[in-house]
Amino acid sequence: MNKKILQILEYDKVKEQFMNALTTAQGQKELSDLVPLTDKDKIQLLFDEVADFRLLTQENGLLNLGKTNDLTEILRRLELEASLSGKEFVEIKKVIQLGINIQRFFDEAENVETPSLNITLEKLVDLSGLIKKLEIFDNAGSLYDNASLELMHIRSSIKSHQSEIRKIMQEMLTKNLASLSENVITIRNDRQVLPVKAENKNKIAGVVHDMSASGQTLYIEPNAVVSLNNKLNQKRIEERQEITRIYRELAEELKPYSFDIRQNAWLIGHIDFVRAKYLYLAANKASLPALTNDKDIILFAARHPLIDAKMVVANDIKFDRTLNTIVITGPNTGGKTITLKTVGLLTILAQSGLPILADDGSRIHLFDDIFADIGDEQSIEQSLSTFSSHMTNIVQILAQADENSLVLFDELGAGTDPKEGAALAIAILENLRKRNVKTMASTHYPELKAYGVKTQQVINASMEFNIDKMQPTYHLQLGVPGRSNALEISRRLGLPETIISEAGQQISGSEHDVNQMIEKLEEKTREVIESSRNIKKIERENQSLHKDLTKVYNQINRERDFELEKAQKEAQEVVKKASLEAQEILKNLNDKAALKPHEIIAARKELEGLAPTIDFSKNKVLKKAKAQRGLKQGAEVNVTSYGQRGKLIRLEKDGRWTVQMGSITTRLSEEEFEVIETPEQIQAKTKNVSKKVTSKVKAQLDLRGMRYEEAELELDNYIDQALLANLIQITIVHGIGTGVIREMVQKKLQKHRHIKSYEYAPINAGGSGATIAILK
């Protein structure tokens, strides 16, 4: 879409309204880079994300996001093995922690599905293992004492030396107070000193580190603490060295994950942007319009987003597929220009995936481009007149617009002779109409009213004017051409009636009749609009009530199901416990030969009859699993609880099997017996064992952090498993690093006879940090 239309319609100013709701640098960057799209599927996904986030928030509250800064430069330096500061490590930590928090929020969310947002969430890499490594920093970027044992010992020594020095210095301060210019211990050259009067310098033996500007005070380090200060400085050097070592090791550990950290940062930014869209939608009563390719622009209660919400006037604009052109006629200052800009701006915002200030049910056609000639764009440098400037712009628009463009003209044909201007305006509109270019134009030429009446696919419109208040209402009236109110306004302003009467006589009868007809149309239109608004109000109230009732109904059902499931589990647990105890008793009795086998079985069946029954016999998943285990009618089994063989008779509704052991029949759970495999089953299982082993092979192998030999062996094994699993495509993540692992991977792939082709992954999927291979 051309940049000029974005400037004319002040697209960037509207984007700024989303900025305050963003908390991440990545989200702000995504907003800054945002431009209108033409791909319907991409735009619809952006709308679906906002809709899903709205449902998520309604059920689980608003997702809280912390502030993060841009990691681009930090990660670049990390990859170049440049040193990072403590604050930079903290910035990395913030992004990683925020990713973990977002994932946890969605995992714990209840009563809602978010399929569109899951597309983003699935790309989030779990970096929770890195958080522990970064917890050695406080929020200011300083290392905690326990960052390492060595650092803890060094800082303990520093504190001990400082305490000893402070004690000695305090004693000397008290003892030599008369010789000092100030009752204070100060610092010079990173060492504690006393401010000694120049005339008393020989009274305190020590090292002079500085002198006051007047020369009256010498800053002396007493000899009593020189040795201790030397030790203290040595410990501080050791502290800096240890901190440098910790930073270096931490950077080496983070480097293999730089791509994942960068990707998470942008994914977090995207979630942040979705959140900002939702907040805008909720705060401004905005909506997500339906997207069409049928040239419908239908806006209910459309408002311009840059006009104060208390001042803006909402308009219904029906510019559907049956219309090609809308001609807005009438006097200036009535809101024609704002109406044109509103249509253009809301269309651009919708094509950017942003909520628009219009009611639900609005529809937006997706245009390839939008062109506008709005306002006074006279070029002073080119010394063009207003008319010439507009006409130059119009010529360019006519050359570039096609049937999938939207064209907006403000005061078309103005700036020249009225008759010629009107003729040009009609000719331009007719040219665009014949080319099937959707066009909205404003004009004050009355000749265009007739064009709007007699031409197919063209409709007149006007901006309502309140005669009683003598001011425009800024309401758009579709189907009603504009009319002049000059005589009536003049009468109300006190112009003599004789002059008004004489002016009226100059107007032809037909023109007078037309004005009366327009006045009646305006009254009828107002009635229809008012009736339509009342209907929509009732519809909104009904929708809101239906939504609330549905929410309550679903909540009641969820609570009911939860309580039923809870009660069922508790009952089963109680019975299971009692059954186990009973089995133990029966087993003991059986061991003592106190009861006969059939008496034991009868007793146990009676006990098990206490358990609540659940019909598992129709569960397809369980049936499939049982079939895979060989559990079917007639199968031979070994009953472990009795140490006897038996045969499966049938599967009961409670999930247990009726098993026959000789002349005895009983019900047993699957845990109480094992299937005895036939030779044929053993042979079939042997043939398929490799297939089962490889059925869980993932389509991605991560070699980051491995040594060369380890990575080489892992790659060989993985390719074998992928071939056995019949995978078509695999991804090997090797990172960027020094390139050694990457070269090894590509050499292996090049030589392997089962690799058809390979290439680096796309930029958004790892770039040169990952290789995608196609298997033969």
From Swiss-Prot:
Gene3D superfamilies: 3.30.1370.110, P-loop containing nucleotide triphosphate hydrolases. It comes from the Bacteria. GO terms for molecular function: ATP binding; ATP hydrolysis activity; ATP-dependent DNA damage sensor activity; endonuclease activity; mismatched DNA binding; ribosomal large subunit binding; rRNA binding. One of its GO terms (biological process) is mismatch repair. Keywords: ATP-binding, DNA-binding, Endonuclease, Hydrolase, Nuclease, Nucleotide-binding, RNA-binding, rRNA-binding. The keyword rRNA-binding applies. SUPFAM superfamilies: DNA repair protein MutS, domain III, P-loop containing nucleoside triphosphate hydrolases, SMR domain-like. Its EC number is 3.1.-.-, 3.6.4.-. Signal peptide: none annotated. It is an enzyme of class 3 (hydrolase). Residues 701-776 form the Smr domain. PANTHER family: OS10G0509000 PROTEIN (PTHR48466:SF2), OS10G0509000 PROTEIN-RELATED (PTHR48466). Homodimer. Binds to stalled ribosomes, contacting rRNA. Belongs to the DNA mismatch repair MutS family. MutS2 subfamily. This is Endonuclease MutS2. It comes from Lactococcus lactis subsp. cremoris (strain SK11). The lineage of its organism: Bacteria, Bacillati, Bacillota, Bacilli, Lactobacillales.
